[in-house]
């Protein structure tokens, strides 16, 4: 390297180390979904970034969905996927597809990209995600809400310097398998593990003042401001439960939560190393 290249690299490394310091030997939970999961090139970059963080001493837990794959599997059965208020209606055929696609194909494809450092798990394993049937005005079928997270298997994996890769199905007291929202699962797992940071990868730039204009990105939100943003209609629709997961995590003791744009290459590293990506939620 030329002298100026060495100096530039050293400066970059120094800055990265400073940003990373609060998270070394700490747990970061990444909720993985959206375009970064569908685009094969982005998927490889995400897994490379997670491997790098693991090598730098950050304990990463990857929680993933698999909506497009599940919908594809349902269509192969001759059915149309059904959603109410953004939640998938999960009948017996659909929960079978969830088990095949989410805990099988999707989970193992991610583990394979982690080159021996990933360990594939689902919420049924070790009774990790204990749930009960979601109570709502409509019947969503086999959809659950988490009542307890058992971290035993996660603790074992993290202590062995492995990267848990978790598909979001759970089980109730009767042994009935339920589909669980991935954002909710990631938040609950992060709280149970005492994670320092929660990262949610999405297909949008972050929280926008005008949802049709990415130039109106709100880069930071203090959690006490969230209700007013809801009142103003800035936080609306599907962003309300997603941001609620972030605020629940922070109010439970997490340092910060990010909703980041998964369409951006190396989005996780950018958010960790002080770059501008998505919206950061924090508490004063």
Which residues does each PLM region occupy?
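Nucleotide/pyrophosphate-binding catalytic subdomain
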Residues: 1-263, 283-284
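Short, basic/aromatic-enriched C-terminal tail that caps enzymatic domains
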Residues: 267-284
């Amino acid at each position: 390297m030329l002298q100026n290249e060495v100096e530039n690299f050293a400066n970059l490394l120094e800055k990265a180390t400073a940003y990373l310091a609060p998270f070394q030997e700490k747990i970061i939970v990444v909720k993985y979904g959206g375009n970064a999961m569908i685009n094969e090139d982005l998927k490889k970059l995400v897994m490379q970034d997670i491997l790098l963080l693991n090598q730098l001493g950050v304990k990463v837990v990857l929680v993933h969905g698999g909506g497009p794959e599940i919908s594809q599997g349902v269509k192969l059965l001759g059915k149309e996927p059904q959603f109410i208020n953004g939640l998938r209606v999960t009948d017996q055929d659909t929960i079978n597809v969830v088990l095949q696609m989410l805990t099988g194909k999707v989970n193992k494809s991610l583990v394979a990209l982690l080159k021996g450092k990933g360990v594939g798990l689902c919420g049924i394993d070790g009774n990790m995600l204990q749930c009960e049937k979601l109570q709502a005005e409509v019947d969503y079928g086999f959809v659950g809400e988490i009542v307890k997270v058992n971290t035993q298997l996660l603790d074992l994996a993290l202590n062995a310097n492995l990267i848990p890769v978790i598909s979001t199905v759970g089980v109730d007291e009767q042994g009935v398998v339920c589909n669980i929202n991935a954002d909710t699962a990631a938040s609950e797992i992060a709280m149970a593990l005492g994670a320092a940071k929660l990262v949610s990868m999405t297909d949008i730039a972050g929280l926008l003042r005008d949802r049709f204009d990415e130039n109106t990105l709100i880069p930071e939100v203090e959690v006490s401001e969230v209700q007013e943003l809801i009142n103003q209609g800035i936080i609306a629709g599907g962003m309300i439960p997603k941001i609620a997961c972030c605020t629940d995590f922070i109010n439970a003791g997490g340092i910060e939560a990010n909703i980041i744009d998964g369409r951006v290459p190396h989005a996780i590293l950018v958010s960790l190393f002080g770059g501008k990506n998505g919206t950061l939620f924090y508490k004063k």
